[in-house]
Amino acid sequence: MANFLLNPKNLPQMLRALQPGMIGAALRYNAAVTARNRRFRSARPHGPWHTTGAIRAIESNERGAILRGEHGALEIYFVSPEVVRVRARADAEFHPPFSYAVVDGAETAPAVECQSAGPGYRLQTSHLICEIAKDSGRLTFRMVDGTPISEDAPGLTWRAGEVRWSRRLPEGEMCYGLGERTGALNLRGRRLRLWNSDPQPAYPSGTDALYASIPFYLGVQFHP
Protein backbone atom coordinates (compact mmCIF):
# COMPACT_ATOMS: atom_id res chain seq x y z
CA MET A 1 0.00 0.00 0.00
CA ALA A 2 2.88 2.35 0.77
CA ASN A 3 4.35 1.90 -2.73
CA PHE A 4 0.93 2.51 -4.31
CA LEU A 5 0.46 5.80 -2.48
CA LEU A 6 3.98 7.05 -3.15
CA ASN A 7 3.96 6.28 -6.90
CA PRO A 8 2.79 9.38 -8.86
CA LYS A 9 1.62 7.16 -11.75
CA ASN A 10 -1.04 5.69 -9.47
CA LEU A 11 -2.38 9.07 -8.33
CA PRO A 12 -5.31 9.26 -10.84
CA GLN A 13 -6.42 5.72 -9.94
CA MET A 14 -6.21 6.56 -6.26
CA LEU A 15 -8.26 9.74 -6.67
CA ARG A 16 -10.99 7.90 -8.62
CA ALA A 17 -11.24 5.35 -5.80
CA LEU A 18 -11.88 7.99 -3.18
CA GLN A 19 -15.46 8.70 -2.18
CA PRO A 20 -16.76 12.29 -2.24
CA GLY A 21 -15.63 14.17 0.83
CA MET A 22 -12.72 11.87 1.68
CA ILE A 23 -10.09 14.23 0.29
CA GLY A 24 -11.41 17.12 2.35
CA ALA A 25 -11.58 14.96 5.48
CA ALA A 26 -8.01 13.76 4.96
CA LEU A 27 -6.75 17.32 4.53
CA ARG A 28 -8.62 18.50 7.62
CA TYR A 29 -7.21 15.61 9.66
CA ASN A 30 -3.66 16.38 8.55
CA ALA A 31 -4.12 20.06 9.40
CA ALA A 32 -5.51 19.16 12.84
CA VAL A 33 -2.58 16.84 13.60
CA THR A 34 -0.08 19.52 12.52
CA ALA A 35 -1.79 22.16 14.68
CA ARG A 36 -1.83 19.95 17.78
CA ASN A 37 1.78 18.91 17.30
CA ARG A 38 2.73 22.58 17.18
CA ARG A 39 0.56 23.48 20.19
CA PHE A 40 1.72 20.71 22.52
CA ARG A 41 5.35 20.52 21.44
CA SER A 42 7.56 20.38 24.53
CA ALA A 43 10.15 23.08 25.00
CA ARG A 44 13.66 21.79 24.55
CA PRO A 45 15.76 21.89 27.74
CA HIS A 46 18.73 24.22 27.70
CA GLY A 47 21.92 24.52 29.65
CA PRO A 48 24.99 22.38 30.15
CA TRP A 49 24.97 18.64 30.68
CA HIS A 50 25.87 17.54 34.21
CA THR A 51 27.77 14.47 35.41
CA THR A 52 28.49 13.05 38.83
CA GLY A 53 31.94 14.60 38.66
CA ALA A 54 34.82 13.16 40.64
CA ILE A 55 33.85 10.45 43.12
CA ARG A 56 34.30 11.67 46.71
CA ALA A 57 32.98 8.72 48.71
CA ILE A 58 31.84 5.13 48.30
CA GLU A 59 29.34 3.22 50.43
CA SER A 60 29.53 -0.51 49.79
CA ASN A 61 26.66 -2.87 50.60
CA GLU A 62 25.67 -6.49 49.99
CA ARG A 63 24.40 -5.64 46.49
CA GLY A 64 27.16 -3.32 45.27
CA ALA A 65 27.78 0.29 46.20
CA ILE A 66 26.59 3.90 46.15
CA LEU A 67 29.21 6.31 44.87
CA ARG A 68 28.83 9.98 45.78
CA GLY A 69 30.38 12.53 43.44
CA GLU A 70 30.76 16.29 43.23
CA HIS A 71 27.42 16.84 41.46
CA GLY A 72 25.47 13.61 41.92
CA ALA A 73 25.65 9.95 42.79
CA LEU A 74 25.67 6.51 41.17
CA GLU A 75 24.12 3.30 42.47
CA ILE A 76 25.62 0.01 41.28
CA TYR A 77 23.20 -2.77 42.22
CA PHE A 78 23.82 -6.41 41.30
CA VAL A 79 20.46 -8.12 40.79
CA SER A 80 22.33 -11.40 40.25
CA PRO A 81 25.98 -12.35 39.57
CA GLU A 82 25.47 -11.60 35.85
CA VAL A 83 22.86 -8.79 35.94
CA VAL A 84 23.61 -5.28 37.23
CA ARG A 85 21.39 -2.19 37.52
CA VAL A 86 22.86 1.32 37.34
CA ARG A 87 21.03 4.42 38.58
CA ALA A 88 22.17 8.05 38.69
CA ARG A 89 20.63 10.92 40.65
CA ALA A 90 21.60 14.51 41.25
CA ASP A 91 20.14 14.41 44.79
CA ALA A 92 21.67 11.01 45.69
CA GLU A 93 18.31 9.75 47.03
CA PHE A 94 18.02 6.15 45.86
CA HIS A 95 14.66 4.77 46.97
CA PRO A 96 13.96 1.04 46.44
CA PRO A 97 12.30 0.61 43.02
CA PHE A 98 8.76 -0.76 43.16
CA SER A 99 7.69 -3.63 40.91
CA TYR A 100 4.44 -5.57 40.59
CA ALA A 101 6.37 -8.34 38.84
CA VAL A 102 8.83 -9.25 41.60
CA VAL A 103 7.78 -10.72 44.95
CA ASP A 104 9.46 -9.12 47.96
CA GLY A 105 12.32 -11.28 49.15
CA ALA A 106 12.47 -13.32 45.95
CA GLU A 107 15.96 -12.09 45.06
CA THR A 108 19.05 -13.62 46.61
CA ALA A 109 21.95 -11.22 47.07
CA PRO A 110 25.04 -12.35 45.14
CA ALA A 111 28.52 -12.21 46.64
CA VAL A 112 30.01 -8.81 45.70
CA GLU A 113 33.62 -7.85 46.35
CA CYS A 114 34.38 -4.11 46.58
CA GLN A 115 37.88 -2.65 46.55
CA SER A 116 39.84 0.47 45.63
CA ALA A 117 42.00 -0.20 42.58
CA GLY A 118 44.40 2.65 41.75
CA PRO A 119 42.53 5.32 39.74
CA GLY A 120 39.14 3.71 40.39
CA TYR A 121 36.93 1.37 42.35
CA ARG A 122 36.22 -2.23 41.44
CA LEU A 123 33.08 -4.26 42.15
CA GLN A 124 33.17 -7.93 41.22
CA THR A 125 30.86 -10.94 41.30
CA SER A 126 31.50 -14.45 40.05
CA HIS A 127 30.50 -13.33 36.52
CA LEU A 128 31.03 -9.56 36.17
CA ILE A 129 33.50 -6.79 36.98
CA CYS A 130 32.41 -3.15 37.27
CA GLU A 131 35.14 -0.49 37.27
CA ILE A 132 34.35 3.09 38.33
CA ALA A 133 36.81 5.90 37.51
CA LYS A 134 37.42 8.10 40.57
CA ASP A 135 38.02 11.27 38.54
CA SER A 136 34.81 11.12 36.47
CA GLY A 137 32.46 8.32 37.59
CA ARG A 138 32.70 6.63 34.20
CA LEU A 139 31.79 2.95 34.22
CA THR A 140 33.45 0.01 32.52
CA PHE A 141 32.02 -3.51 32.63
CA ARG A 142 34.06 -6.63 31.93
CA MET A 143 33.70 -10.36 32.16
CA VAL A 144 35.81 -11.98 34.88
CA ASP A 145 38.44 -12.96 32.29
CA GLY A 146 38.92 -9.26 31.45
CA THR A 147 36.91 -9.19 28.19
CA PRO A 148 35.29 -5.72 27.90
CA ILE A 149 31.50 -5.58 27.66
CA SER A 150 30.64 -1.88 27.98
CA GLU A 151 32.64 1.32 28.43
CA ASP A 152 31.16 4.77 29.11
CA ALA A 153 32.02 7.68 26.79
CA PRO A 154 31.36 9.89 28.78
CA GLY A 155 28.48 7.96 30.37
CA LEU A 156 25.41 9.19 32.23
CA THR A 157 24.71 12.92 31.95
CA TRP A 158 21.59 14.98 32.66
CA ARG A 159 19.98 18.41 32.62
CA ALA A 160 16.45 19.66 33.29
CA GLY A 161 14.01 17.22 31.70
CA GLU A 162 16.60 15.09 29.90
CA VAL A 163 18.91 12.19 30.63
CA ARG A 164 21.60 11.00 28.23
CA TRP A 165 23.79 7.90 28.25
CA SER A 166 26.70 7.42 25.87
CA ARG A 167 29.09 4.50 25.57
CA ARG A 168 31.67 3.18 23.17
CA LEU A 169 30.12 0.80 20.65
CA PRO A 170 32.22 -2.38 20.58
CA GLU A 171 33.20 -3.74 17.20
CA GLY A 172 30.71 -6.35 16.06
CA GLU A 173 28.00 -5.53 18.62
CA MET A 174 24.50 -5.83 17.14
CA CYS A 175 21.99 -3.17 18.15
CA TYR A 176 18.33 -3.96 18.78
CA GLY A 177 15.34 -2.28 20.44
CA LEU A 178 14.31 1.40 20.69
CA GLY A 179 10.67 0.67 19.86
CA GLU A 180 9.00 0.54 16.43
CA ARG A 181 11.56 0.98 13.64
CA THR A 182 11.65 0.28 9.92
CA GLY A 183 14.42 -1.30 7.92
CA ALA A 184 16.83 -3.95 9.13
CA LEU A 185 16.38 -5.47 12.58
CA ASN A 186 20.00 -4.66 13.48
CA LEU A 187 20.06 -0.86 13.93
CA ARG A 188 23.84 -0.49 13.96
CA GLY A 189 25.03 2.46 11.88
CA ARG A 190 21.74 4.40 12.09
CA ARG A 191 20.89 7.58 13.99
CA LEU A 192 17.40 7.35 15.52
CA ARG A 193 15.21 9.72 17.50
CA LEU A 194 13.26 8.74 20.62
CA TRP A 195 10.22 10.72 19.56
CA ASN A 196 6.74 9.58 18.57
CA SER A 197 5.35 10.65 15.21
CA ASP A 198 2.36 9.82 12.98
CA PRO A 199 3.72 10.07 9.40
CA GLN A 200 1.11 10.88 6.77
CA PRO A 201 -0.14 9.31 4.60
CA ALA A 202 2.43 6.49 4.49
CA TYR A 203 6.11 5.94 5.01
CA PRO A 204 8.92 4.07 3.22
CA SER A 205 11.53 1.86 4.85
CA GLY A 206 13.95 3.91 6.93
CA THR A 207 11.44 6.55 8.06
CA ASP A 208 12.19 8.00 11.50
CA ALA A 209 10.43 8.62 13.85
CA LEU A 210 7.32 6.40 13.98
CA TYR A 211 4.54 5.58 16.41
CA ALA A 212 6.36 3.93 19.32
CA SER A 213 9.72 5.03 20.71
CA ILE A 214 10.89 3.00 23.71
CA PRO A 215 14.20 3.76 25.48
CA PHE A 216 15.17 0.09 25.72
CA TYR A 217 18.40 -0.99 24.06
CA LEU A 218 19.68 -4.53 23.62
CA GLY A 219 23.28 -4.98 22.53
CA VAL A 220 24.31 -8.49 21.48
CA GLN A 221 27.96 -9.52 21.45
CA PHE A 222 29.57 -12.85 20.62
CA HIS A 223 32.74 -13.91 22.41
CA PRO A 224 34.64 -17.10 21.52
What are these regions (language model features)?
Residues M1-P224:
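N-terminal accessory segment at the very beginning of proteins
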